Each structure stands twice: as C-alpha cells, then as structure tokens.
Amino acid sequence: MGVYFLKRLEEESSKSIFDSFDLFIGTSAGATNALMLGMNGCKIEDLEKFWTVENLKKIMNQSFIDKTSIFQTRPKYSNDGKKEILYSFFENKKIGQSLKPVVVTAYDLEARKPILLSSYADPKIPAVHAANASSAAPIYFPTASMEDGRWLIDGGIATNNPSLIGYVEAKKLFSTNNIKVL
C-alpha cells in the first residue's frame, strides 16, 4: 500500500499502523514496507524517509552507458544502490527477528512458481535479501541469488496483490474467524 494511504489511515484511526495489524504482507515495494513495519515497528515517518526522492535516485541509478545505449543488454539498474538503502534500514537482521509476522512474495525461477518468504517459516533469511528478491523486477533489476541457491524475482510476477495470501496466512496463524484484510 502506498505510504500516503497508510499515513491517512493512521491519522484517521489515531492508532499506529504497527498496532493496527497482526500480520504484514507485501509484494515488490510493498514487501519492503511490510518488512519495515513488521520488523522494526517503524512509524510512517520512517517509511517516508525510506521512499525519498534521494533514495529512489540511488535505487534506480544507471551508468552513463546504460542511459545512452540504444539496446538494453542487462538489467536497467544494478542492485548496489537498492541494497545500500535496504542495509541502512535493516542492517543484518533476519526476518525471523520481526516483531510481528511478516510475509513477502517472490517468484522462484527454477521451480517456476510463486513462493512466500515469511518470518515464521524462513526465520534465517536476511531482511535485505527478502526485500531485494521480492522487488527484483525483470528488466529493471538483476535476479536475486539467495543463500540457499535459489534464484528469485519480483513477487509481482505472479502475486501482484497479495491480499488473499495474507488472508490465508492469517487463518493459519491466528485462531479466530474475525480476520479483516486491508
């Protein structure tokens, strides 16, 4: 969800986003937001600091050759700027260190299927790797090489809107029928 929407929701409810939800799920850029909220219990101001124009320029930095080339022979952006920004927020934390359950989507190239990286099933995955994999959009960013040898790309390839997955995961985790998805 967009940071602006989350900010408005927080203002209207007079309750922090972290306190309003029991599980955070996201795909691509939303995966980074979900990880930041679930792992750090961050405030909306922290999300706004992450998604500044300055950070976006670092994330989407191109070499002069890539900017002037007629043909694209490699991903448009490197992972260097993206990983630098991700490390500045997550440091070396693993997703299992989250304060609330977090799920991010990705797509496994070898298995040819969507996958979930979660704080409860994959606790040892570095948060930076999870965020990088879920946002490794083909053509734009390189494929994410995981520590276990898997090659992952942007979760939006198969699950652009992870709401239903969030509902199913919440049903598994919480013993209640009172589940609301936003």
Question: Model features per residue range: what roles?
Answer:
Residues 1-182:
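Patatin-like phospholipase
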